[in-house]
Amino acid sequence: MNDPLDSLSNDEFEIIETFDPETEDREDQWSIQQSIRIEPISIQMPNTLQSQRAPSPVGSKAPESLKDEDPDRTPEASIVETPLLTETLKEDRTPMSTPLASLVNSSQSPEFTLQNMSIVSESECSNNSSLVNVADVESTEIALRTSLLLVSELKSQLQAAKMSESTLLKSNSNHEIEENKKLSEKMEVMKNEFELKMQESAASVEKVIQEKDSAIEQLKVQLAQSQQVAELWKQGAEKNSNAQYSDSKTTIDRLLEENSKLRNLVDEEVARRLEESERRKLAEDQLKHARGGSVFDPPASFVASQLAERTTYSLNLEHELITLRKELEETKEALKKSVEESSNKDEIVSALHELAGPTGEHPHARFERAGDQQSEAEMSSTWSAGRLLELSRQIVHFISHQ
């Protein structure tokens, strides 16, 4: 790629430098392309040279002698073309002895003087060359020397800029390499720390998982034991509930039968009392007719005592009947409650929790204790039923004697 600064153009020459970035130790390759546009009027000659020669007619109209010799001459041909300059520019681009060759190898550049910078020697100025041609060549020579001086200065500036740029790039690259090295070391340290933390967290998580697994195993064992205990308790509860239900049903049936018997006895006693009162009334009427219409008048104290005794007896009998009915209802409620408790699943679950409690009591012992309590309750209910039956019998016996 060509650097835009490597291509310089002025009004006389176009100087091109080919740059290859892959080769640092290269020789500057300069090429001069012939693009001569000389206008000597615009060239400022040095004061010393202007005082030594006459004004050059280059750029003005050609002499009349030249016009007469070539009538077909174009306006561009007003610049006098000397054979010497033309042949010099048409030579092959080989190392020259002119100041252009000194730019290629700056270490061997001689001191610039008017003698060694001139491209026209004294021998080349023959009698055939006119003064006009010599002045034209000198003006061209001055312009060329000025351009070469500018090119050499630009070349030195360009080389200095390239050297400074390469130095800056090297320093920047070294700084970036150091920063990248520090950053990589820092990243390596962070990576090691992160790996260490990950290993520690993995170890802690593994430990927690093992603890939870052991706790789950213990819970499974406890659950299996609780299921076995619950099954045993359920079997015992079913047996006890069936036995209690059968016993309670038998007791209730017996009590109902006794109650029906007592009611029949009471009805019979009431009917007998009514029949006796009817017979007494009939006997009193018969006795009254037998005495000739006289009324039998028993003593009032006797009648009052008999009425008081009969009233007390009736009240006692009624009180006993009410008491028996209440006890019978209570027995029915107790039986109903025991049946409901035996069929309630929530009580089974609560019993399971009690069995798994911190008391440490063996399940069979708890079953035996529960069975003892249930047997005591059965005995209490049986004793109450027997007491009621005994009282009923006493009442019947008392009524029959009366």
From Swiss-Prot:
Residues 168-347 form a coiled coil. The keyword Thylakoid does not apply. Residues 64-75, 361-371 have a biased composition (Basic and acidic residues). Expressed in oocytes, but not in spermatozoa. Residues 9-27 have a biased composition (Acidic residues). GO terms for cellular component: cytoplasm; endoplasmic reticulum; sarcomere; striated muscle dense body. It is found in: Cytoplasm. GO terms for molecular function: protein homodimerization activity. Residues 1-79, 356-381 are annotated as: Disordered. Keywords: Autophagy, Coiled coil, Cytoplasm, Phosphoprotein. GO terms for biological process: autophagosome assembly; regulation of autophagy. The keyword Ligase does not apply. The modification Phosphothreonine is found at residue 74. Residues 44-54, 372-381 have a biased composition (Polar residues). Self-associates. Interacts (via N-terminus) with ikke-1; the interaction is direct. Interacts (via the LIR motif) with lgg-1. Interacts (via C-terminus) with ubiquitinated proteins. Autophagy receptor, which is required for allophagy, an autophagic process in which paternal organelles, including mitochondria and membranous organelles, are degraded in early embryos. After fertilization, recruited to ubiquitin-modified paternal organelles and is required for the formation of autophagosomes around the paternal organelles. Also plays a role in the regulation of autophagy in germ cells. This is Allophagy receptor allo-1. It comes from Caenorhabditis elegans. The gene is allo-1.
